[in-house]
C-alpha cells in the first residue's frame, strides 16, 4: 500500500546526518518487494532491479528539522518530508515495485535514497556521482504530478566574522556590527547590479541574509553573519567568492557549499517519455526551473545524461509547518512515473 508505506517513512525522523533508521527501513521494504537492496558506504538506501540500460532514480531521505505531526486529513498526508522529499522517493519505490511485479521492466533501475541533501555537503550525491554512469536520471523532488523540473540554480554560502577592540558607542569609528551590515549591503548591491535588466529569477543572483548576530565579552566586540546566494547558469561559485572577498570590510570570510547552476535539455527520450505519460494520465505537462538547489546540481555535470526532477507535491510547502502531500496526486504521480519508465526502457533498449 503506497499510502501506508509513505506514512511509515514519515513517522521515522531523519534530519540530515541522522538518516540511519529510515535507510534501514527502506532497505527492508525494498528487499521484501524483490529489490537487491543495501545501505551503501555513505549511508544511502539503495535498491536495484532489472537488467539493461541503467536508469538512476536519485531521491533523498533526509529532511530539515521541525516536527510536523503525521496525520491524514481531507485526503492529505501531513508530515515532515511528505513533500521534500520522502514523498517523491516513495513514488520511486512504488512505481518500480509495480513494474517489477507486472513484468514490465526493460531497464535496470537503481533507486538511491540519498543522505544529507538538505545539508551543504550533499554527501549522498557526491558518493554516487563516480559510481554510476546512467543512461538517464530522475531526481526525486516535488514538481507536481504534471510538471517536470529541468533545472536548479547554483548556490554559494558566505560566513563572515568581524572583531575589534571594544570602544565607546559615542566614538567616531564604525561599530563592528556596522561592518557586518556594510558587507551585507555591498553583497546585495553587487547582486542588484548584476540583475539589472534580467527579468527571470532563474537568471538572477538571489542573496538572502540567513543569520546575523553581534556581541561583546567586555574587551572585544564581534559580529557574525551568514549569507546564502542562489546563482544563475553563468556565475561560477569560485569566481563569485573571489569577487566578494574584496568587499570583506576587514572581516574573516569563509565560503562553502558552492555548486554551479544546472539546466537539463528537454529534447531527449526521458523528457518525451514523461510528456507522453502525463498526457496519458489526463494532464497537460509543463516545465519548471527552480530557484533552489538539488542533487541534480551535483550529478548532472558529471553524468551528462538526460535528467529531470519529478515528484508529487507543492514545493511552496517545503520546510513549512504545514507540509503535506495530496494523496490523489501522490498516487497519480506513481502512475505517471511507472508509465514514463516503461516507455523509456522500451526506447533505450
What residue ranges belong to the model's regions?
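Buried hydrophobic packing segments
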Residues: 26, 89-99, 128, 180-184, ...
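Acidic/histidine-rich catalytic neighborhood of metal-dependent amide-processing enzymes
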Residues: 90-153, 349
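Acidic/His- and Gly-rich active-site-bordering loop/insert found
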Residues: 1-82, 304
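Short glycine-aspartate micro-motif
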Residues: 54-56, 77, 135-139, 157-159, ...
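Short beta-strand segments
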Residues: 58-60, 112-114, 138-141, 161-163, ...
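Metal-dependent amide/peptide-bond hydrolase catalytic core
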Residues: 38, 142, 150, 156-349
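Active-site nucleophile and cofactor-binding loops and adjacent substrate-binding regions
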Residues: 77-85, 286-292
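Short, structured coil segments at secondary-structure junctions
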Residues: 73, 132-133, 249, 303
Amino acid at each position: 500500500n503506497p499510502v501506508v508505506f509513505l506514512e511509515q517513512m514519515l513517522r521515522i525522523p531523519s534530519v540530515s546526518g541522522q538518516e540511519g533508521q529510515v535507510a534501514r527501513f527502506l532497505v527492508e521494504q525494498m528487499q521484501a518487494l524483490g529489490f537487491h537492496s543495501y545501505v551503501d558506504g555513505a549511508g544511502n538506501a539503495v535498491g536495484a532491479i532489472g537488467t539493461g540500460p541503467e536508469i538512476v532514480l536519485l531521491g533523498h531521505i533526509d529532511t530539515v528539522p521541525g516536527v510536523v505531526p503525521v496525520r491524514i486529513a481531507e485526503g492529505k498526508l501531513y508530515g515532515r518530508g511528505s513533500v521534500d522529499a520522502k514523498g517523491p522517493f516513495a513514488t520511486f519505490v512504488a512505481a518500480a515495485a509495480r513494474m517489477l511485479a507486472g513484468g514490465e521492466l526493460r531497464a535496470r533501475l537503481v533507486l538511491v535514497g540519498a543522505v544529507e541533501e538538505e545539508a551543504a555537503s550533499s554527501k549522498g550525491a557526491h558518493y554516487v556521482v563516480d559510481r554510476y554512469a546512467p543512461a538517464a536520471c530522475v531526481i526525486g523532488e516535488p514538481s507536481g504530478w504534471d510538471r517536470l523540473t529541468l533545472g536548479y540554480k547554483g548556490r554559494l554560502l558566505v560566513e563572515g566574522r568581524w572583531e575589534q577592540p571594544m570602544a565607546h558607542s559615542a566614538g567616531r569609528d564604525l561599530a563592528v556590527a556596522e561592518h557586518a551590515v556594510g558587507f551585507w549591503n555591498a553583497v546585495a548591491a553587487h547582486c542588484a547590479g548584476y540583475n539589472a535588466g534580467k527579468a527571470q529569477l532563474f537568471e538572477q543572483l538571489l542573496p538572502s541574509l540567513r543569520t546575523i548576530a553581534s556581541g561583546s565579552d567586555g574587551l572585544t566586540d564581534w559580529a557574525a553573519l551568514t549569507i546564502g546566494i542562489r546563482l544563475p547558469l553563468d556565475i561560477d561559485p569560485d569566481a563569485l567568492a573571489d569577487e566578494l572577498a574584496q568587499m570583506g570590510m576587514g572581516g574573516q570570510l569563509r565560503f562553502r557549499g558552492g555548486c554551479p547552476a544546472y539546466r537539463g535539455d528537454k529534447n531527449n527520450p526521458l523528457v518525451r517519455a514523461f510528456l507522453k505519460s502525463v498526457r496519458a494520465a489526463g494532464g497537460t505537462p509543463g516545465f519548471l526551473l527552480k530557484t533552489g538547489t538539488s542533487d541534480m546540481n551535483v550529478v548532472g555535470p558529471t553524468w551528462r545524461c538526460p535528467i529531470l526532477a519529478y515528484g508529487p507535491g507543492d514545493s511552496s510547502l517545503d520546510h513549512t509547518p504545514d507540509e503535506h502531500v495530496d494523496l490523489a496526486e501522490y498516487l497519480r504521480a506513481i502512475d505517471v512515473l511507472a508509465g514514463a519508465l516503461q516507455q523509456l526502457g522500451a526506447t533505450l533498449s
